Amino acid sequence: MVKKVLEDASYQVQLKNPSEVQTPEQIDLEIVALDNLMLRIQNRRAEFCRARNQSALISSCLPAELIAEIFLFALAMSPSQVPSSSVATTLPLVLGQVCSAWRNLAWELSELWDTFHCRISKGRCPAQARLLSEWLLRSHERPLSIRLSFLDDEFHWNDLGAPIDIVNVLNRHRHRWLALDLVLAPSWYEPLRMETTLDTLISLSLRPTASAFSAQRMDMFLLAHQLREISLSHHYLRNVHLNWDNLIKISFSTASVDEAVELIRRCNNLVTCILDELYPFEDEYALPLTPFSHRRIEVFHIGCRVNLDTEIFIILNCLALPSLRNLSIMLPEQVGNPLQTIGELITRSECPIQKLRIHGHTLLEQDMIDFLQSVKSLKSIEN
């Protein structure tokens, strides 16, 4: 094969034996000539390799619609799509690096760009904001599911002078927000306050940087009339302003006992209620003198901080939940048997409960058997 290439007219060269060369100058000329020949052969080889690779590309073998489905499946399976993952979404950019055909397809496939997790660095925030702007343009006009978190230690963002470039970019597309999951720097609250309706936003998750309690007024989502699900932590309920009757699912961590009861009272259409890391009673809201009924809650989870087991019982004693099907309670190990309080809630509610989970406190096997026999609708107890 090499002999054939060397004999080709485009590679004509007269190869000499070393014995035919007499002087050092002639030897140097021969070496240069051979170097040039090898370079030309390498270049030609690279051309043939590119041609071979191009012909073997998936983009030349499959229709664009099928390749697009493969891209979307790869994105759905990527680690960045796992909730609470620390991995940023980079797959669309990686696909664009393979070849121009893949890049052209990926850049036009808006579904690749409408759901993402962006990890922000304080030092690179302006540059990341420009890249985010380009990213969002590629999503065309699709509804956006956005998650933002920080590469830096969150304490570095916990001041009013933190960059707001990213928020300014997001605000230009607020009419397309479908789901937002944000860690809020103190400087971000004010830019988010814009008097425009958020007609597409249905899911919202917010917590302050460094999990430090925020006293800032949170009214920037009051015009989100389609909001159905919200997750909050380290905010005071008195500062949170939402269309409470629209909510069907809420997760609130670090609420005080009276905030938790008030929250349930406000959300008349709540179906799923998750209350984690309860704090002691803060006397912000008065507890009801008698239990009140919430007729829609079907799934109820409640968990307390260490040594605050009585707070859970206080909340349960305030409620009647006639639609309750699934109850989950997280308790410290040293707490007394909670089954009596739970039984009173079930009796008072006359609910069709089917599943009970009690974690943190170990129940006696006979107690669980007796409880299952006494509550006819109950199908399982997990402990």
Cite the ranges covered by each PLM segment.
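Leucine-rich repeat
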Residues: 1-383
